[in-house]
Amino acid sequence: ADRSVPLYRRKTDATMHAAGGMLSSAPDLATFLIAQLGDGKVGRKQRLPASVIRASHARQADTDGKYLDFARDGYAWGWYTGEYKGRRMLHHFGGFAGFHAHLSFMPDAGIGLVVLNNEDMLGARLTNLIADYAYGIALGEHGIAAKADERFAKLASDARELEQAAVRQRDALKARPWRLSLPRTAYAGRYQHADLGEVRVTLQADDSLAVRWGQLQAVASGFDKPDHVRVE
């Protein structure tokens, strides 16, 4: 696959699934974090009530988890809480296919970070290392540059290995035999479901079956079971 080709999927009302989502930019999210660190103020203007900001930072539930380098001992109003590099931190991450977002800040240190990247396989790990380096620099952490060099080199090595593994997986999927009981032309058409809507199957010039379901599209491949296909 050509990784330079943009992913066709974009967030729309039809694909704003799971817990939902939002569209924003790095500058706007940075302004949002400035408000978090300034009791709702951005510059001299009170953008959000200070009482709301303080309440949103208060832990509402206890948790006992971790995401990469980030401890999660509680959950506030949309913010995970925990200690990071010896300081209290609030953070929330998110993502979509081909994209990963990172928002975090240290209220006591007055430091915040926004990282948006469009890498698919290692996006979360990449932003994790950027955060390690950025906070390390901001806090004057000894040896952070050498540590970052080592971690980024390991990530680059892992990326090459994952790329090769992805190629092997795609080749294995393409090699699966088709076990359809009818000619492929028989499966082309429109399929309607009361809850799932319409799925369109089209026989293409290369004899492959293209599947479209609303905003989603893919090319089917063979599957192990009779009269089944794989659609990803």
Task: Describe each PLM feature range.
Residues 1:
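Extended acidic/charged loop-beta regions that coordinate divalent cations
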